Amino acid sequence: MSKLIYLDNAATTQVYPEVLQEMLPYFSEVYSNPSAIYSFASESKKAVDKARTSVAELINAKTDEIYFTGGGSESDNWALKATADAYASKGKHIITSTIEHHAILHTCAYLEKKGFEITYVNVDENGKVKLDELEAAIRPDTILISIMTANNEIGTIQPIKEIGRIAHEHGVLFHTDAVQAFGHIPIDVEEMNIDMLSASGHKINGPKGIGVMYIRKGVKILSFIHGGAQERKRRAGTLNVPGIVGIGKAAEIAKNIMAERSAKEISLRDHMIDRILTEIPYVRLNGDRHDRLPNNVNVCFRYIEGESMLILLDQAGVCASSGSACTSGSLDPSHVLLAIGLPHEIAHGSLRLTLSEKNTVEEIDFVVDELKKIIERLRSMSPLYEDFVKKQNK
């Protein structure tokens, strides 16, 4: 198979042709600034309003609760830093989990330097937040709980509705980083008790450089970027109209095809998992087997170094990763895999394969066949594996 097989959709996705076509006029034809008052600007404003409605409908929010940002990381920073600023008089305690994206963890580290106290609740072996530990961590000065909807590395989906309920029962705001889940699994901000939500365009076949922040009416969040009066005076800066149009169209498509796309991806995902676990020895599936994103496969191979595996897969025309693209190049094992209890030597042998509905069974079979050869080749060069096999055969 000579064509490229892309299995890194958790890192970014291909822009749908329909999304691109929707965006194109707003680069050179309808190029007006939507904040202007002349009639030419009304076309851009209508496009922004339409996109805001599409995003709101995807998560059952009101249109005036949707704010456009420069990406998921900005939205995460906004949620944590602005909440800290606005509610510091009530308290300086924030709760999050040990497996959050670094956009959350590094922001928490920043806030710690500013005098805030962060509690990092643990997860179980499948990556699910321990609800009893979460509730026990709440204090009178707790102002925010931030837990991701689904993990970007191992795909585990959190019990968001229950977490939101716990937060609200204690009078605490609840933010969720939904960057990996938005458009892929059903999200209802009302039913799930969500006060703030972060999302990104390029994870749902939309453009890069555009994100979403949902803020429930009544939540006192301050401006994060200061300047003009855009986004109801909460996020200054000329609106990225093509990007906004793109994420709006991508959200509209995601809402319409979610069930069909999920079914296709789950079928491919489970086929891949079954073959890997059956045909390759000494392998571990990471993440919850059932409560996981439809397109996520994350496994660890014993006596394998992840980077070597990725290089050989790349030579075979397969794009994959060993964890988050935001931490690629790091020699440290994944903080997510360490948090679910894996030792360093096993965490180093991780592989993340994230599919799309465009992939085929033939592609999945090709990748597994190549993977079998690669694992056998790498283990044949490992003295540790040789010693392990000898001990097993005694």
Q: Where are the predicted features?
A:
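Pyridoxal 5′-phosphate
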Residues: M1-K394
